[in-house]
Swiss-Prot record:
Protein's name in the database: Large ribosomal subunit protein uL3
Post-translational modification note: Methylated by PrmB.
Modified residues (N5-methylglutamine): Q151
Pfam families reported for this sequence: Ribosomal_L3 (PF00297)
Gene3D superfamilies: 3.30.160.810, Translation factors (2.40.30.10)
Lineage: Bacteria, Pseudomonadati, Pseudomonadota, Gammaproteobacteria, Aeromonadales
GO cellular component: a single term: cytosolic large ribosomal subunit
Transmembrane segments: none
Binding partners and assembly: Part of the 50S ribosomal subunit. Forms a cluster with proteins L14 and L19.
């Protein structure tokens, strides 16, 4: 199943098993995911559904967005996401996906936008080792060192790890244990940490490697 749910990262807490074992969990709030469009091979070249969730102020909704949501007959949400469909899966515009979609799932993949760290050096960004703090080393404690050769090849290879912007990129953490599905409060409790900051959007899917 490629269908997932779009939720909001509330934060972390812990729960206890009957044996008294403490399990750290991330709480994901999943408001109803409303289907705004159903794409098909005939019209779009592939099968997928487009969903929205949450709410957005009317003053923040553009006219094209307002028309799109009105055509689907659903309330404007805080964004649009897409999930590919397998052959045989059918959905209708206006239908809702809720947390019970994952009721029988044990492991999930969670996708989010990692916390931005700004401009970071190679030690923080790529885990480079530092050079000696003493023993004759001056001003080269955290420098990356050589970035290549001389005349041959006479250039720096693509992908060379250097200092630069760190974080604020799409990240997926795989095979996280789904500890609990709270259908009454629309919550997912996932063991461990998930990418992103508090209140960030996350996508929860059944694990592809489970």
């Amino acid at each position: 199943m490629t269908i997932g749910l779009v939720g909001r990262k509330v934060g972390m807490t812990r729960i206890f098993t009957e044996d008294g074992v403490s399990i750290p969990v991330t709480v994901i709030e999943v408001e109803a995911n409303r289907v705004t469009q159903v794409k098909s091979v005939e019209t779009d070249g592939y099968n997928a559904i487009q969903v929205t969730t949450g709410a957005k102020k009317a003053s923040r909704v553009t006219k094209p967005e307002a028309g799109h949501f009105a055509k689907a007959g659903v309330e404007a949400g805080r964004g649009l996401w897409e999930f590919r469909l397998n052959n045989g899966e059918t959905f209708t515009v206006g239908s809702e996906l809720k947390v019970d979609l994952l009721a029988d799932v044990k492991l999930v993949d969670v996708t989010g936008t990692s916390k931005g760290k700004g401009f970071a050096g190679t030690v923080k960004r790529w885990n480079f080792r530092t050079q000696d703090m003493t023993h004759g080393n001056s001003l080269s404690h955290r420098v990356p060192g050589s970035i290549g050769q001389n005349q041959t090849p006479g250039r720096v290879f693509k992908g060379k790890k250097m200092a630069g912007h760190m974080g604020a990129e799409r990240v997926t953490t795989q095979n996280l244990e789904l500890v609990r599905v709270d259908a009454e409060r629309n919550l997912l409790l996932i063991k461990g940490a998930v990418p992103g900051a508090t209140n960030g959007n996350v996508i929860v899917k059944p694990a592809v490697k489970a």
